[in-house]
Regions:
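Active-site phosphate-binding/coordination module
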Residues: 36-144
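Polybasic, low-complexity association/targeting segments
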Residues: 28-31, 39
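Conserved acidic, metal-coordinating active-site core of Asp-based
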Residues: 123-244
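A general structural motif
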Residues: 13, 49, 75, 173-175, ...
C-alpha cells in the first residue's frame, strides 16, 4: 500500500502520543516487548526533546515496562485506561473514575450477556480483578495459562468472582476501566463487534464505550483519550497542533477527531482508518513525517 503524504507546513511537532497494542507493539515481540526499530525511534524522539506520551487502554504496569525498555525516563508521560488516568513526572495529575456503586451495578447487569468469557476491572490496585465465571473449568484453566504466557505483555491479575465483587465494593478501590472479553481469535473479535451496539444502546448514557479487538471497554461517561491528552498538553505547554497522534482501534478515534496530525496503522479496522489522515505500515514509518 502506498502511503499518503501530508505536509505539516511550519508546525513543529513537539510531542508524539502513541497507542501501545497494535501500534507501538506492532509487530509483537513477546520477549523484547518492542521491535528494535520502534524502540530506537521512541528513544531518539525522547532524546531530541520531544514529549513521548503513551496513550493506552492498559493500566500502568506495561507502560512502566516500556519506559524501562526504552531506557529514557525524561519526557515520557502516560495516559492510561483510555484517558481515565494521566501520569506526568511520576505523578497522577488527572483522573476520572467510575463510582464503585455504579461499577457494581454494571457488573451485575453484564451477567445476562453469556457471550462474555471474562470481565476485567482496571483499578488503582497493582493487580486487575478478573471474573472468569463465564468460562467452564477447563477453559478457565486454559485462560489462566494463556494469561501467564503473554511474555512481556503480561499484566498482574487476581481471579475470582467473589474477589472481584469485594474489590469493587472496597471504598479504597478506584475503578478506571471495566472490560468484558469475548474470547480468543477472530471469533472473539466478531462477537465483541456484534455485542458492541447492544452495549451502547443499553449503557451508552452512563458510560463511554469502545471496542478493542475481542474486548469492549467501559469508562465513565466523558472519559476518553483525547480529553486526557489535552489536559496533559496544557500542563506541558504544548499546543494541540504540535502533537502527532498514532493508534489503531476504536478507542483511538477521539484522538483522530481532535488532533489534526493523526496517523493510523494500516491493519486497523476500516472505520478507524477513515478517521485519520495518514496510514502507516509500521509505527517507525512515522520517521518519514516527523524529524
Amino acid at each position: 500500500m502506498k502511503l499518503c503524504i501530508i505536509s505539516f507546513g511550519d508546525i513543529m511537532i513537539k510531542a508524539i502520543a502513541t497507542d501501545l497494542d497494535g501500534t507501538l507493539f506492532y509487530p509483537k515481540r513477546r520477549f523484547r516487548l518492542i521491535s528494535t526499530a520502534n524502540r530506537q525511534f521512541i528513544r531518539n524522539a525522547s532524546l531530541s526533546g520531544k514529549e513521548v506520551i503513551l496513550v493506552t487502554g492498559r493500566n500502568l504496569f506495561v507502560p512502566g515496562k516500556v519506559i524501562k525498555t526504552v531506557a529514557i525516563k525524561k519526557n515520557i508521560s502516560v495516559v492510561s485506561c483510555n484517558g481515565a488516568r494521566v501520569i506526568h513526572n511520576g505523578e497522577t495529575i488527572y483522573e476520572e473514575t467510575v463510582p464503585n456503586e455504579k461499577a457494581l451495578k454494571l457488573f451485575y447487569a453484564l451477567q445476562k450477556y453469556k457471550e462474555i468469557k471474562s470481565l476485567m476491572f482496571f483499578t488503582n490496585r497493582f493487580k486487575m480483578y478478573v471474573d472468569s465465571s463465564g468460562l467452564n473449568p477447563l477453559m478457565r484453566a486454559i485462560g489462566w495459562v494463556g494469561l501467564n504466557l503473554q511474555g512481556a505483555y503480561f499484566e498482574p491479575f487476581q481471579l475470582g468472582k467473589n474477589r472481584t465483587i469485594k474489590g469493587i465494593q472496597d471504598p479504597e478501590t478506584k475503578i478506571y476501566k471495566i472490560m468484558p472479553w469475548f474470547g480468543l481469535g477472530k471469533k472473539g473479535v466478531e462477537t465483541a463487534r456484534k455485542v458492541y451496539d447492544k452495549f451502547v444502546e443499553e449503557f451508552g448514557d452512563e458510560y463511554e464505550i469502545w471496542y478493542s479487538g475481542p474486548a469492549i471497554e467501559f469508562m465513565d461517561k466523558g472519559t476518553n483519550k483525547a480529553k486526557a491528552l489535552k489536559k496533559l498538553l496544557d500542563v506541558c505547554n504544548i499546543n494541540y497542533d504540535e502533537v502527532a497522534v498514532v493508534g489503531d482501534s476504536g478507542n483511538d478515534i477521539p484522538l483522530f477527531e481532535n488532533f489534526e496530525n493523526s496517523f493510523v496503522m494500516a491493519q486497523a479496522p476500516e472505520e478507524v482508518k477513515q478517521k485519520a489522515k495518514v496510514r502507516l505500515k509500521s509505527f517507525n514509518d512515522l520517521s518519514n513525517y516527523i524529524k
